Amino acid sequence: MVGHSLSELLPNPWPLRVLSAFAVGLWCLAVFRSTSSQQREVRLWALALIPLMPAFVFSLGNAVRQGLASVIILHAAIFLMDKKRWQFAFLSVLGVLVHEVSIVFVAAVAAMRMPMSWARAFLLISPFVSFIVVWISARFDVDLASYVRYAGYDEGAFHYLKFAVYFSLANGLLFLSTRRAEADHFHLMAKAFALTVGCASLLLVYEVPFERMVLYSDVLLPVMLAMSVVNLKLGVLGRIWLVGGLLALGFAFWTSDSVQTTLTEGKAHAEDGRIQFYKIPD
């Protein structure tokens, strides 16, 4: 409804720009809500890391409904971490109404208080599930791809590299969460991240569905990575190297062909009328 109203008031592509900016603002607000006023350095690092997250471009810059839903559910997750269940339920429903597939992210967040051993087991088993299910269904002449959205878009095997990165991150964050003495949200966010990556890995055999699903986990990363960096207690030289590395990573990320193509095509779709009245084919 909001998107429809914006499309009536503003020319393309401004409705999408407004929604994207609103979602980015919500993401930044979540950084402050999930940290205390004493964690100023964590907040600074987290805000600096947001533009380096793939979801910043591929969700908030293209699949806008998914990006908006993911940050709404991030706020729902923060409420749940503080044991405010009614607020969690309300924002979760709102997020699912924005983008129905977000119910998977809601499920992962809702299960973040499960035992650590269960979260690890799910993360380890999930990559094999889709291949086993596809193999079994093929034996019975069942085409699962016809039931999975975007399953027909197969452009290669690059997503397996992405899986390796996210899988390693999930395991690393779970390990770090067991070493933290601070009473913060890190351990719950680590489990939510691992469960979201696990849910995405259930679709690992399908490139685009996996890549779209794993983007939900990105909204959890900036705060956890920032907390990890601050805990390293780096000296001046270490901070210089880290900042330099992040600047180089940011330059490589924002000048990459995939990012430029995503942003250019998304803008073209809006300007030439292919996105009408917020009917976004994402």
Task: Give the location of each predicted region.
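Short acidic/glycine- and proline-prone juxtamembrane loop motifs at membrane-interface regions
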Residues: 60-66
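Short hydrophobic/aromatic helix or loop-helix immediately within or flanking a transmembrane segment
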Residues: 1-10
